[in-house]
């Protein structure tokens, strides 16, 4: 994995490790490529999933351009040293398979897997992520046996830029990485400053620029209703400067929109606790793969309003609540669900039924089939 912070990709990785350890008696070694400092939330979740150690072998330097220059020569030397170190350290685990999450771990896995004795790896594309378009990335993508994306749009770079053969490209949405836990909603609402008699709208998402909390705030502030309504945001504001700035900006925006007293801005709280408080789940964003949080909303039987990204469509269709990122449309969809309890119930029941096929058992079966078809 990339960082020891409990986002969607990391939950998927740890949940998969937990399942493989408990059901197949696998020995799983976890390597982070960009972080030697796990968050408390990540560390506790990793230990609960049977991970004994979190390994880190230094910051990767893996960008090598197709050019002749002193700078590029230095980059090449650094990259070769890093790859050599990764081969040496990962070989100690005697891996049979390397399962990467996100692009940089995929790049590393593709470059080292044969040398460390692994039988297979793959490129694992999971939504918004960076590409370097350099010589090493090109080599890694050519080397990798196959590519898995969690939504169709995740394959576009491989199809259009790298011209990867279509028989090497697969779409495999992730599984639901949490179990539904029913908790005392009244006490949790009190904990989070949510009036107990309110209809609660929530958006669980990183405090990052590609997540559109501002859009939801603007739409929420324009809703006209005699009912008590409350908005909840959950992310982790303390990850870095970007997340702190984003958090502070939406707090300031809520004050300028005169809705600050009807919004709870949460950071680092339990996802399951917040899900138990919600009546409506929202995810509006610039880009997504197959978003974990939409799957979690569905697991908890919530109506969901989501940007009409390919991954959201794959989860929710057919649905009238797949929308463009438009303030007025979002406001009107929120209004419909606030005004109509029966509609909320029906949408929630439909979503709970749709999500049943996204189990970890089905995910493992599909992954096994892909590996076998590519061997």
Report the location of each language-model feature.
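Nucleotide-activated donor-binding/catalytic signature segment of Leloir-type glycosyltransferases, i.e.
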Residues: 53, 244-268
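Short hydrophobic beta-strand element within catalytic cores of glycosyltransferases
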Residues: 303-306
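Aromatic "clamp/platform" in nucleotide-sugar-dependent glycosyltransferases that forms part
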Residues: 286
């Amino acid at each position: 994995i990339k960082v020891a912070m409990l986002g969607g990709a990391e939950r998927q990785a740890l949940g998969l490790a937990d399942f493989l350890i408990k059901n197949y008696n696998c020995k799983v070694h976890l390597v982070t490529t960009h972080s030697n400092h796990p968050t408390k939330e990540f560390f506790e979740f990793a230990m609960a999933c049977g991970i004994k150690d979190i390994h880190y072998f230094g910051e990767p330097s893996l960008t090598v351009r197709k050019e002749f220059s002193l700078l590029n020569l230095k980059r090449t030397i650094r990259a070769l040293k890093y790859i050599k170190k990764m081969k040496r350290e990962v070989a100690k685990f005697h891996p049979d398979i390397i399962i990467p999450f996100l692009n940089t771990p995929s790049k590393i896995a593709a470059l080292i897997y044969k040398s460390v004795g692994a039988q297979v790896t793959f490129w694992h594309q999971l939504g918004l992520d960076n590409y370097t378009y350099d010589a090493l990335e090109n080599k890694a993508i050519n080397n990798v046996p196959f590519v898995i994306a969690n939504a169709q749009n995740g394959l576009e770079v491989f199809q259009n830029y790298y011209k990867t053969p279509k028989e090497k490209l697969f779409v495999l949405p992730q599984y639901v990485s949490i179990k539904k836990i029913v908790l005392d909603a009244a006490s949790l609402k009190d904990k989070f400053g949510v009036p107990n008699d309110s209809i609660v709208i929530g958006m669980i998402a990183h405090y990052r620029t590609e997540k559109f909390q501002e859009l939801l705030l603007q739409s929420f502030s324009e809703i006209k209703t005699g009912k008590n309504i409350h908005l909840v945001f959950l992310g982790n504001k303390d990850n870095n400067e970007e997340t702190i700035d984003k958090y502070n900006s939406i707090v300031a925006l809520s004050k300028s929109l005169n809705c600050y007293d009807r919004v709870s801005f949460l950071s680092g709280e339990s996802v399951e606790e917040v899900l138990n408080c919600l009546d409506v789940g929202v995810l509006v964003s610039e880009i997504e793969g197959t978003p974990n949080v939409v799957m979690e909303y569905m697991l908890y039987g919530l109506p969901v309003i989501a940007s009409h990204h390919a991954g959201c469509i794959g989860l929710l269709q057919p649905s009238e609540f797949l929308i463009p990122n438009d303030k007025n449309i979002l406001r009107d969809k929120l209004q419909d669900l606030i005004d109509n309890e029966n509609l909320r119930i029906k949408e929630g029941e439909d979503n709970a039924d749709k999500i049943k096929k996204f189990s970890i058992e089905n995910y493992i079966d599909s992954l096994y089939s892909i590996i076998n078809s590519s061997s």
